[in-house]
Regions:
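A short glycine-rich, Lys/Arg-flanked "PGG" loop and its adjoining helix->strand segment in the class I
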Residues: 76-88
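Short "lid" loop at the C-terminus of a central beta-strand within the Rossmann-like core
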Residues: 68-70, 97-102
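Conserved beta-strand signature within the Rossmann-like core of class I S-adenosyl-L-methionine
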Residues: 89-96
Length: 134
């Protein structure tokens, strides 16, 4: 989830015209993100649960540190829900620990979702996977 909002807030500060959706299942985390966005004057940040995003919304960019430890079935369901919602030409960046299956996740995205997926960056045991719309 978005936690207190570091990724969402950084993206909103860097992209002054973008609408940023920060998702979490934890209401405390969502409240912290909302408060931090308000303190920074970021009215374009929406902190909500996944149910708060209308089905017709498409994303140009997704940044995520997906919850790998929830298990493959839950993780795969999550990715099946959100990655296909990338707009044409959209891209997703997924931060995954190498020792928690970044390579197998990359192969799964390519084979199961049919989406091009490659390593965007790698450092200190983490990989950033880049997923593009086909």
């Amino acid at each position: 989830g978005c936690g207190w909002g570091p990724i969402a807030l950084t993206l909103a500060l860097a992209s002054r015209h973008a609408t940023v959706h920060a998702l979490d299942v934890n209401e405390r985390a969502l409240d912290l993100t909302r408060r931090n966005a308000a303190a920074l004057g970021l009215e374009r940040v929406t902190a909500t649960t996944a149910d708060g995003i209308p089905d017709d919304v498409r994303f140009d960019l997704i940044w995520s540190n997906p919850p790998i430890r929830v298990g493959k079935a839950v993780l795969h369901d999550l990715l099946r829900t959100w990655l296909p919602r990338l707009a044409p030409g959209g891209v997703a960046y997924l931060v995954v620990q190498k020792n928690l299956g970044s390579d197998s996740l990359q192969r799964w995205i390519e084979s199961e979702l049919g989406m091009p997926c490659g390593r965007f960056a790698s450092s200190k045991g983490f990989r950033v996977l880049e997923v593009r719309t086909p």
